[in-house]
């Protein structure tokens, strides 16, 4: 059986797509969609991707009107949470460390739920030279 090899895109409706794309770029480092096919789009690091339908009545996403939630892998959850909070974002850090890693939650400017995940065996952040 032929199988898909990964997720090629995440498409969703937005009230102000340009503003929302800027927010994702400025806050999370996701490059906007290129304006021509000769340029490269955002490329994610290799790693696990969880694909999981949830029961319709789940409370996991928060607001019941939201039918989806995206989970982004991060290398250093504490650094990402600090960066987002410094930019004025309300981020809820889950105090519990789970067998598969650590998590935090926030919403984008249009109220879409976002989960940040630092996998348990996440590689260390790259060294910086100051």
Where do the language-model regions lie?
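Conserved short beta-strand elements that form part of the metal-binding/catalytic scaffold
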Residues: 29-66, 106-109, 113-120
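Short linear motifs in intrinsically disordered
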Residues: 29-33, 72-73, 93-96
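Short loop segments at secondary-structure junctions
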Residues: 14-16, 74-77, 109, 120-121
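Core segments of cupin and vicinal oxygen chelate
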Residues: 1-5, 11-50
